[in-house]
């Protein structure tokens, strides 16, 4: 069973999510619904990593940038990390080198891979999920048909 905020998105919002993965991620209800779906599939580490990277890229302070980079690395990248994401060895090594001198782009390659994985794998499953279908069904039931 999925649960998101008690405040539901409008039917129109829910339908927009199927148009593009970016639409889903840009909408707070869409993001919450997608996170709940990923959690139900035991793969929420992907969206959590992606969101951590988005936050990381907005960080201005060099000290905070370094501490956030270490946290992201420890949480998602290093071997046996609690929320280890599924990326190739080469990308992991590149990140390990990149965080020696932290820049806003040190996780870019991994973030792109995770985004692509979610867009091509998790997103289509989300759109076919009972939860999303139920939102769409409610959408159809709320439409007034004029003859």
Residue ranges and their predicted role:
Residues 1-147:
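Long, compositionally biased intrinsically disordered regulatory segments in eukaryotic proteins
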């Amino acid at each position: 069973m999925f649960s998101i905020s008690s405040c539901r998105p409008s039917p129109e919002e829910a339908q927009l999510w199927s148009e593009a993965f970016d639409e889903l991620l840009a909408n707070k209800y869409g993001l919450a619904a997608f996170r709940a779906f990923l959690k139900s599939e035991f793969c929420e580490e992907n969206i959590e990593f992606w969101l951590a990277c988005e936050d990381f890229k907005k960080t201005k302070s060099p000290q905070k940038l370094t501490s956030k980079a270490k946290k992201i690395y420890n949480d998602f990248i290093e071997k046996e990390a609690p929320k280890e994401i599924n990326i190739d060895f080469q990308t992991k090594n590149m990140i390990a080198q990149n965080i020696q001198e932290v820049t806003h782009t040190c996780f870019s390659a991994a973030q792109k891979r995770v985004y692509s994985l979610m867009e091509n794998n998790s997103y289509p499953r989300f759109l076919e999920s009972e939860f999303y279908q139920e939102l769409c069904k409610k959408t159809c039931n709320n439409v007034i048909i004029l003859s």
